[in-house]
């Protein structure tokens, strides 16, 4: 019987040059798996806790405490367990930690080991990670939610909304869809350069021009779609990540759009979204309101929920109990899936199953601080998420996921690509 023989971690760097945890699990048959944990910039209040050292190293962002927890507390309890019982491995770490948000061990320590265990198990069986996690049912290639213009916390410009994305919804396969958005990205660079604006990129590879309003990036993207020879609405759709929790004034409870020098109530912001959706082929809005503004989310869902995918990121933080509450109250209709928000592979899978049972779409997602680790590419296919959010075709930490998806698609051969289908039920 194969068992976990050794576990260790070390401190490596993410795409922003900040330290993060790399965990390695070695099995008794000699196979091993490693995983690098991502980190977010715009984070929800109820996310699992990322353990940082808080000393002088790396401006306080070192992760040696988390590394030590892997090498001692976690390793001591997991060595001898079966790597093929992911639920037991993850539950054991949760028991060791003893808190609801992994504040003792650190979610970055726990997730690294959880992911590395899954990878080691797949390697031991000599099957791809997506096949190990998803079985024979893993057959859906995700539609990319492709970051093309950055604002908010992800860029140093005057645009308030955090991400403007395009989605290749009018194509029959992943490869053609990826080609289309990659070509549009190159044309957008030319459009922005012609405008005399910077073509510097943000954390996730999208451009970060200093535009005049929150609507202007959409019109600029529409121009790039046309110049690339594609049809907006028919082949290419638009998605927004507002990250509204970063915009709200906690005292006035109004949303501050600094780039436009105005403040809006929840209802006014919903009307603003409705106006944008009437002008442009917007199919998805993420975190359109603050994570605490559930009354506002109710207004948003009632007004746009039948027409647009309304995604909860900070709202749900990949937490099954919070998603269940949202389902009960009729809030949003989709869940962004970030494994490091909840802490383990098993808990992430639980949240996805709950969402899918209740007809909520799932979008597998990276974080703004990433690495060469492409675990989420396999994870998205394994659980038939149907959508993935993993940046643009710039920065190798984002490209790693797309290249892995191309590899997976070639291996599967018969893979499905849902295109517009995730949005047709809205």
From Swiss-Prot:
Enzyme Commission code: 4.2.1.11
Catalysed reaction equations from the record: (2R)-2-phosphoglycerate = phosphoenolpyruvate + H2O
Active-site residue list: 204 (proton donor), 338 (proton acceptor)
Swiss-Prot/TrEMBL cofactor(s): Mg(2+)
A GO BP annotation: glycolytic process
SUPFAM superfamilies according to UniProt: Enolase C-terminal domain-like, Enolase N-terminal domain-like
Classification via SMART domains: Enolase_C, Enolase_N
Highest taxon in the source lineage: Bacteria
Protein purpose: Catalyzes the reversible conversion of 2-phosphoglycerate (2-PG) into phosphoenolpyruvate (PEP). It is essential for the degradation of carbohydrates via glycolysis.
Protein name: Enolase
Species annotation: Aliarcobacter butzleri (strain RM4018) (Arcobacter butzleri)
């Amino acid at each position: 019987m194969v068992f976990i023989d050794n576990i260790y971690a070390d401190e490596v760097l993410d795409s922003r040059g900040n330290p993060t945890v790399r965990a390695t699990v070695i099995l008794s048959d000699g196979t091993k798996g490693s995983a690098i944990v991502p980190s977010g910039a715009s984070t929800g209040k109820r996310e699992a806790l990322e353990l940082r050292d808080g000393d002088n190293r790396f401006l306080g962002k070192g992760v040696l405490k988390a590394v030590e927890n892997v090498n001692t507390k976690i390793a001591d309890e997991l060595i001898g367990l079966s790597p093929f019982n992911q639920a037991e491995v993850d539950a054991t770490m949760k028991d060791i930690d003893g808190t609801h948000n992994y504040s003792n061990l650190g979610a970055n320590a726990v997730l690294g080991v959880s992911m590395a265990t899954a990878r080691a198990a797949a390697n031991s069986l000599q099957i791809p990670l997506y096949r190990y996690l998803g079985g024979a049912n893993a057959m859906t290639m995700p539609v990319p939610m492709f970051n093309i213009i950055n604002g908010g916390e992800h860029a140093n410009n005057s645009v308030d909304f955090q991400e403007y994305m395009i989605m290749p919804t009018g194509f029959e396969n992943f490869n053609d869809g990826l080609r289309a958005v990659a070509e549009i990205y190159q044309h957008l660079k030319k459009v922005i350069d012609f405008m005399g604006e910077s073509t510097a990129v943000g954390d996730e590879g999208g451009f970060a021009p200093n535009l005049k309003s929150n609507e202007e990036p959409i019109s600029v993207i529409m121009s790039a779609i046309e110049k690339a020879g594609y049809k907006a609405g028919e082949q290419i759709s638009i998605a927004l990540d507002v990250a509204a929790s970063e915009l709200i004034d906690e005292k006035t409870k109004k949303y501050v759009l600094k780039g436009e020098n105005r403040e809006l109530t929840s209802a006014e912001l919903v009307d603003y979204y409705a106006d944008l959706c009437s002008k442009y082929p917007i199919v998805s809005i993420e975190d359109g309101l603050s994570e605490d503004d559930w009354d506002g989310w109710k207004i948003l869902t009632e007004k746009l929920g039948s027409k647009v995918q309304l995604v909860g990121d900070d709202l749900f933080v990949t937490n099954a109990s919070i998603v269940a509450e949202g389902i009960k109250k009729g809030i949003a209709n989709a869940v962004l899936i970030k494994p490091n928000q909840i802490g383990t592979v098993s808990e992430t899978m639980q949240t996805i199953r709950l969402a899918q049972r209740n007809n909520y779409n799932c979008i597998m997602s990276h974080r703004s601080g990433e690495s060469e680790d492409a675990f989420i590419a396999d994870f998205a296919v394994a659980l038939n998420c149907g959508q993935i959010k993993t940046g643009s075709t710039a920065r190798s930490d984002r490209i790693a996921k797309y290249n892995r998806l191309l590899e997976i698609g070639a291996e599967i051969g018969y893979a499905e690509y849902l295109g517009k289908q995730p949005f047709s039920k809205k």
